[in-house]
């Protein structure tokens, strides 16, 4: 990859995730610390745009679910236009998402995917179940274990929690908690489904990205890797969580290049907020629930190999609040690309914001 193409890719990413131009599209339930909406994506299906995400209220999984409500509701919005306005049309509570006699104590990220027969909705929840016996002493009172479920329907408005089933779960101690699914088709011909997911070890010491694959004709996912992209060595040493895979338009300088995808990810120096030395370089460092953003690039014919672009420093930081900028997701249309993400505000809430980059602007960025 030439330096020129690398620079244009970075310019493209910054133009898409423009922190100053971002507009709020979904507000959290309160404009206060610990409240946000997001962690989902947008699809276009049957002539309508559909947006999924979860409302999160104050609480801390590191100290137990008794610390607050936390992941409260999975909501689905619709709009006839990619620019909104968005109307809430469907909602799932914790009790709605319970199955196999396991109580849901918190709702985390979700992901829509269009398939040949309709729509899939992947949902991550924390269920009230115990750690494996040999590490039970590490489990805090009131906490559970995360895994990922799936609901399938011909249309979005027909999604029903009564058909919910498990998608992936593991007893691997280093990746015991699985959440924040990112579903995508492995090819334009839909030869199978890829599922990135975030994992935490039983110690909650780090956040990692795993990859599961379900080939065409298969009914179940197989976990291919718990380390689809390695954690970084500086600003993202504690957390590297992929939140989106974006196939980059092949225009201008990219017309003669092999097809590429951009991978947005969340990163952090530590899962807890670090006490900064008074003489240190003051900066947002990222921590659990307040991550900041980076990106990587991968050639599609070499999937899942990913080249990290944000090696030494983060690329996406909110100019407000804690600097948190996370859960980036994108949707490509004929007119351009819409990006959404959670952005920290002055009141430390995290509404879902968006920015649209026109295809005309994208063509200008990659012009020869």
List each language-model region with its residue ranges.
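Beta-rich carbohydrate-recognition and catalytic domains
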Residues: 1-39, 43-105, 113-180, 184-321, ...
């Amino acid at each position: 990859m030439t330096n020129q193409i690398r620079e244009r890719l970075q310019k493209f990413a910054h133009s898409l995730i423009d922190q100053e131009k971002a507009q709020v599209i979904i507000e959290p339930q309160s404009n206060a610390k610990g409240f946000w909406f997001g962690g989902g994506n947008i699809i276009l299906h049957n002539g309508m745009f559909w947006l999924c995400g979860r409302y999160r209220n104050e609480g801390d999984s590191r100290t137990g679910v008794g610390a607050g409500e936390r992941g409260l509701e999975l909501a689905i919005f619709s709009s006839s236009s990619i620019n909104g306005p968005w109307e809430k049309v469907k909602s799932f509570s914790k009790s709605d998402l319970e199955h196999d006699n396991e109580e849901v104590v918190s709702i985390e990220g979700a992901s829509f995917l269009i398939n040949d027969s309709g729509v899939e909705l992947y949902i991550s929840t924390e269920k009230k179940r115990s750690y494996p016996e040999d590490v039970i002493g590490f489990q805090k009172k009131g906490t559970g274990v995360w895994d990922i479920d799936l609901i399938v329907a011909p249309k979005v408005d027909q999604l029903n929690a009564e058909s919910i089933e498990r998608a992936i779960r593991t007893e691997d101690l280093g990746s015991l908690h699985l959440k924040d699914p990112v579903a995508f088709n492995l090819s334009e011909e839909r030869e199978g489904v890829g599922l990135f997911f975030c994992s935490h070890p039983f110690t909650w010491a780090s956040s990692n990205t795993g990859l599961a694959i379900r080939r065409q004709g298969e009914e179940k996912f197989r976990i291919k890797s718990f380390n689809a992209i390695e954690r970084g060595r500086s600003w993202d040493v504690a957390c590297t969580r992929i939140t989106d895979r974006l196939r980059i338009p092949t225009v201008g300088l990219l017309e003669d290049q092999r097809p590429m995808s951009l991978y947005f990810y969340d990163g952090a120096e530590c899962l807890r907020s670090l006490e900064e030395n008074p003489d240190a370089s003051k900066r947002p460092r990222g921590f659990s629930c307040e991550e900041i953003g980076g990106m990587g690039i991968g050639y599609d014919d070499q999937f899942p190999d990913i080249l990290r672009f944000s090696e030494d420093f983060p690329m996406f930081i909110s100019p407000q609040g804690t600097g948190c900028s996370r859960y980036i997701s994108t949707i490509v249309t004929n007119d351009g690309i819409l990006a959404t993400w959670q952005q920290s505000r002055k009141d430390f809430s995290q509404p879902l914001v968006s920015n649209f980059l026109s295809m005309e602007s994208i063509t200008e960025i990659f012009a020869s």
